[in-house]
């Protein structure tokens, strides 16, 4: 892609997200979401092949349907209340429609159908943007709507997302699809805690983005996209394999890694609000995710295929630009748990 065109696309993507996040007016927030959607399409089609074209078409059709539903909800709210304020959507029909539209944009169940297919059809870098950056704008709107949303609809979507995210990833062999189902599951955790403590939703989103960025950067550096290529990682890059193993354990929420912190705080918050059955159900369903994370760890780290190469280290390196981004992300992804008391005091 032309560097000038790419810089323009990325700038517009950044501007669309920031417009939505800083807006308190529904019309400008909707415009930011549309800028976000339209600039994401050429990013998904960075490589022109039938699969990426199909993925971009699916993404456009789903997001356009969600945008149309959101605009219909805003029009209904305007007819009844006469205002465009995000924090004052008083009509229950409009509120539920807007909530479902934003859930579709987030890719939470039962509106998740497009996420695995689109993620699998594109390269790793567009998939990384899709599963991380594209969550910011819709979640910022849900954060502002948290006081008057339909909690039953949020709980239903959250529990379904955790269940489908764990269940759908069990029989997958493609890493992008596994990470897509992992994203659906994490969206469920964020949605359920949203009515109780929106700050914990932001904490969970921050740690999820750090973990997902780390995994995608490792997979991009090692050119790994499937379980079969994952089995060769230990022979080629042992250090990267160990980093991938610890990051996957953190993504599954295993102590004493960073991913355990948001789950711990969310379960504590739910039990503090006299909700016992829901956190217990969430913790049990999260074991499904932990199973396929352990499956990835087994294939990458605990299985070494027979090899005729006696050299344990790579002797010929490609010319890559060294960066501090990945080590920093890996450190943050695995070592933030001791900060839990300080973070819980800031809530």
Swiss-Prot record:
<feature type="transmembrane region" description="Helical">
    <location>
        <begin position="150"/>
        <end position="170"/>
    </location>
</feature>
<dbReference type="InterPro" id="IPR050175">
    <property type="entry name" value="Complex_I_Subunit_2"/>
</dbReference>
<keyword id="KW-0249">Electron transport</keyword>
<dbReference type="GO" id="GO:0032981">
    <property type="term" value="P:mitochondrial respiratory chain complex I assembly"/>
</dbReference>
<keyword id="KW-0813">Transport</keyword>
<keyword id="KW-1278">Translocase</keyword>
<comment type="function">
    <text>Core subunit of the mitochondrial membrane respiratory chain NADH dehydrogenase (Complex I) which catalyzes electron transfer from NADH through the respiratory chain, using ubiquinone as an electron acceptor. Essential for the catalytic activity and assembly of complex I.</text>
</comment>
<dbReference type="InterPro" id="IPR010933">
    <property type="entry name" value="NADH_DH_su2_C"/>
</dbReference>
<dbReference type="GO" id="GO:0045271">
    <property type="term" value="C:respiratory chain complex I"/>
</dbReference>
<feature type="transmembrane region" description="Helical">
    <location>
        <begin position="242"/>
        <end position="262"/>
    </location>
</feature>
<keyword id="KW-1133">Transmembrane helix</keyword>
<comment type="similarity">
    <text>Belongs to the complex I subunit 2 family.</text>
</comment>
<keyword id="KW-0830">Ubiquinone</keyword>
<dbReference type="GO" id="GO:0008137">
    <property type="term" value="F:NADH dehydrogenase (ubiquinone) activity"/>
</dbReference>
<protein>
    <recommendedName>
        <fullName>NADH-ubiquinone oxidoreductase chain 2</fullName>
        <ecNumber>7.1.1.2</ecNumber>
    </recommendedName>
</protein>
<feature type="transmembrane region" description="Helical">
    <location>
        <begin position="178"/>
        <end position="198"/>
    </location>
</feature>
<dbReference type="Pfam" id="PF06444">
    <property type="entry name" value="NADH_dehy_S2_C"/>
</dbReference>
<dbReference type="GO" id="GO:0006120">
    <property type="term" value="P:mitochondrial electron transport, NADH to ubiquinone"/>
</dbReference>
<feature type="transmembrane region" description="Helical">
    <location>
        <begin position="3"/>
        <end position="23"/>
    </location>
</feature>
<dbReference type="GO" id="GO:0072593">
    <property type="term" value="P:reactive oxygen species metabolic process"/>
</dbReference>
<keyword id="KW-0520">NAD</keyword>
<dbReference type="InterPro" id="IPR001750">
    <property type="entry name" value="ND/Mrp_TM"/>
</dbReference>
<feature type="transmembrane region" description="Helical">
    <location>
        <begin position="59"/>
        <end position="79"/>
    </location>
</feature>
<keyword id="KW-0999">Mitochondrion inner membrane</keyword>
<keyword id="KW-0812">Transmembrane</keyword>
<feature type="transmembrane region" description="Helical">
    <location>
        <begin position="326"/>
        <end position="346"/>
    </location>
</feature>
<feature type="transmembrane region" description="Helical">
    <location>
        <begin position="274"/>
        <end position="294"/>
    </location>
</feature>
<keyword id="KW-0679">Respiratory chain</keyword>
<dbReference type="GO" id="GO:0005743">
    <property type="term" value="C:mitochondrial inner membrane"/>
</dbReference>
<comment type="subunit">
    <text>Core subunit of respiratory chain NADH dehydrogenase (Complex I) which is composed of 45 different subunits. Interacts with TMEM242.</text>
</comment>
<feature type="transmembrane region" description="Helical">
    <location>
        <begin position="199"/>
        <end position="219"/>
    </location>
</feature>
<keyword id="KW-0496">Mitochondrion</keyword>
<feature type="transmembrane region" description="Helical">
    <location>
        <begin position="93"/>
        <end position="115"/>
    </location>
</feature>
<dbReference type="Pfam" id="PF00361">
    <property type="entry name" value="Proton_antipo_M"/>
</dbReference>
<keyword id="KW-0472">Membrane</keyword>
<dbReference type="InterPro" id="IPR003917">
    <property type="entry name" value="NADH_UbQ_OxRdtase_chain2"/>
</dbReference>
């Amino acid at each position: 892609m032309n560097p000038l065109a790419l810089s323009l696309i990325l700038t517009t993507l950044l501007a669309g997200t920031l417009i939505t996040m800083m807006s308190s007016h529904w019309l400008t927030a909707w415009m930011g979401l549309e800028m976000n959607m339209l600039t994401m399409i050429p990013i998904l089609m960075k490589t022109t092949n039938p699969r990426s074209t199909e993925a971009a078409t699916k993404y456009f059709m789903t997001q356009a349907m969600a945008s149309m539903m959101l605009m219909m909800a805003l029009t209904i709210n305007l007819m009844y209340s006469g205002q465009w304020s995000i924090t004052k959507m008083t009509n229950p029909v409009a509120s539920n429609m807007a909530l479902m539209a934003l859930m579709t944009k987030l890719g939470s169940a039962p509106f998740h159908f497009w996420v695995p297919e689109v993620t699998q059809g594109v390269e790793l870098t567009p998939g990384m943007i899709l599963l991380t950056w594209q969550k910011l704008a819709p979640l910022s709107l849900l954060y502002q709507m948290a006081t008057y949303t339909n909690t039953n609809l949020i709980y239903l979507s959250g529990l379904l997302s955790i269940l489908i995210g764990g269940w759908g990833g069990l029989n997958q062999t493609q890493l992008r699809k596994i990470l897509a189902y992992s994203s659906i599951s994490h969206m469920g955790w964020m949605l359920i805690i949203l009515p109780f403590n929106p700050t914990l939703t932001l904490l969970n989103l921050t740690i999820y983005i750090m973990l997902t960025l780390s995994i995608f950067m490792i997979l991009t550096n090692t050119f790994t996209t499937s379980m079969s290529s994952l089995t060769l990682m230990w022979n080629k890059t042992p250090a990267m394999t160990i980093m991938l193993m610890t990051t996957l354990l953190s993504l599954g929420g295993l102590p004493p890694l960073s991913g355990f912190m948001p789950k711990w705080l969310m379960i504590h918050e739910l039990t503090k609000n006299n909700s016992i059955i829901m956190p217990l159900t969430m913790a049990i369903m999260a074991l499904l995710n932990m199973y396929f994370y352990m499956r990835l760890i087994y294939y990458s780290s605990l299985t070494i295929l027979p090899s005729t190469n006696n050299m344990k280290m790579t002797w010929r390196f490609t010319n890559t630009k060294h960066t501090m981004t990945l080590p920093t992300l890996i450190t943050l992804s695995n070592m933030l748990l001791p900060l839990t008391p300080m973070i819980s005091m800031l809530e």
